[in-house]
A protein has these predicted regions:
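Specific transmembrane alpha-helical segments of multi-pass solute transporters/efflux pumps
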Residues: 1-6, 34, 40-86, 122, ...
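Juxtamembrane C-cap of transmembrane helices in multi-pass membrane transport proteins
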Residues: 4-16, 21, 28, 67-77, ...
Length: 220
């Protein structure tokens, strides 16, 4: 399901502006989840209102910010690079777990981190050591690395989640994500960078809403 995000993110270039994608994405996901979890929302809020800071940080880092930088990066790099950089996310999660939670990195994890980065470098350079030495990251790649770091913080933060079902928790995250996306959408509008979707853009948005936004998050 995550793969749809990479493909749709690139397809959205020139069809719908990146920050509009984020706002529309979480607006419709929040409506869908509210309907599905309507019976649990009130009781869940009784728990989450005491974890409001955690809820806001998680929603902003893992959803609003990650998605915003992801779709911005898609304008400056190719889908393969997006997928490759995103493939390093488990390594970022291990590193941030060490920094934030002081978790020890065991030998298999360390080997996994090394293999992940080496594999990405080999693919990017086509196995050519000389090409690797001359490798230059473009703007989109750098933005994508930053986006993955933000999502890694979110993934590690999930270890501190209260005893709440994943679907209803995702519902509250989607509220934060949508509200948090509005300043970016306003900025995009006021700077004349807003691109409204046509038929193709609507199809792309629908794919993003259903697969990486809803199904992928639930299974994650």
């Amino acid at each position: 399901f995550w793969a749809f995000n990479t493909i749709a993110g690139r397809a959205a270039v020139d069809e719908v502006s990146p920050l509009l994608v984020v706002s529309v994405r979480w607006f419709f996901v929040s409506i869908l989840l509210t309907f599905l979890c309507r019976k649990e929302l009130f009781e869940t809020w009784k728990v989450l209102k005491y974890r409001l800071k955690w809820l806001v940080i998680m929603g902003l880092f893992g959803f609003t910010s990650f998605n915003s930088f992801y779709y911005i990066a898609a304008h400056d790099t190719i889908a393969i690079n997006l997928g490759l950089v995103q493939g390093t996310m488990p390594a970022f999660i291990i590193i941030i777990s060490r920094i934030w939670l002081k978790e020890k990195i065991n030998i298999p994890q360390l080997i996994g981190v090394i293999i992940t980065f080496v594999a990405v470098l080999l693919v990017v350079s086509s196995g050519n050591l000389y090409a690797l030495m001359k490798l230059q990251l473009n703007k989109g790649d750098i933005v994508m690395i930053f986006a993955c770091t933000l999502y890694a913080v979110y993934a590690v933060g999930l270890k501190k989640k209260p005893n709440i079902g994943p679907l209803v928790l995702l519902t509250f995250f989607s509220y934060v994500a949508f509200i948090g996306s509005l300043p970016g959408l306003f900025y995009e509008s006021f700077t004349s960078n807003l691109v409204l979707p046509g038929i193709k853009g609507i199809i792309i948005l629908s794919i993003i809403i259903i697969f990486p936004s809803f199904l992928a998050q639930i299974f994650f």
